[in-house]
Amino acid sequence: MCSSDLVKHISGELFNDLLKYIRKQTGMELPAVGEYWSNDLGRLLYYLDSCENEMSLFDVPLHYNFFSASQAGGAYDLRTILDNTLMKERPQNAVTFVDNHDTQRGQSLQSAVGDWFKDHCYAIIMLRQGGLPCVFYSDYHGNPVRETPAVLNLGKMIMLRHFYAYGEQEDYFESQNLIGWVRRGDEEHSNSGLAAVLSNGDNSGPLHMFMGEKFADAVFSDVLGNCTEKVTIGKDGWADFSCVPGRVSIWVTQEAFENLIVYE
């Protein structure tokens, strides 16, 4: 992995030539990521074009969308959470993240995402197609010095991505305070497939979503434990998925639920 800080001060053309040279000399398709700290998607796209997409960039606009959503609460329209982001516009070049060392409280770019909203953010970057997710150390382990707690469900999100977040994706961004999506799994990953429901207000659903006829009669459970009732997929592949108001539910097959092992 090649990485560079403050790439806005280095021409994209230079990185284009440099990365091609390194890959040719090593015979390896080394991935590369740069930090271009700007909330202006146009600037990031221009830079990626200038280096001919030879590198990825941290998705700073997505971080600021997360921050804004965590500050606004139910007034934020979740249907717009991906607007003007690399994850949406250039997913193959997006390194997605929730927070980092610079966005922590007291730092120069302070814009720490509210703790209540971090499950929502990690569900988006870990369980959707598009973008390469980057987990912040302090979110996984906590930071006692800054009195920042660990994101308790982050370990589960990581394992969900590894084992079950595969296959075709379909979005159900149906209301301001309630969105969801499904991943329909694939043949290569046993029990893969999931349904995600995110609420940032009083709306708990349900969302009527199509998992696919191959899941007919399958029983799904909420891995995060926010909903205790199980959901049975209809013979037509459709089902109603809910979540607790203001929280997140990730639904997987009962077999996947029972097999899920989280290493804390």
Describe these PLM feature segments.
Residues L6-E264:
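Active-site-proximal helices and loops of the catalytic beta/alpha 8
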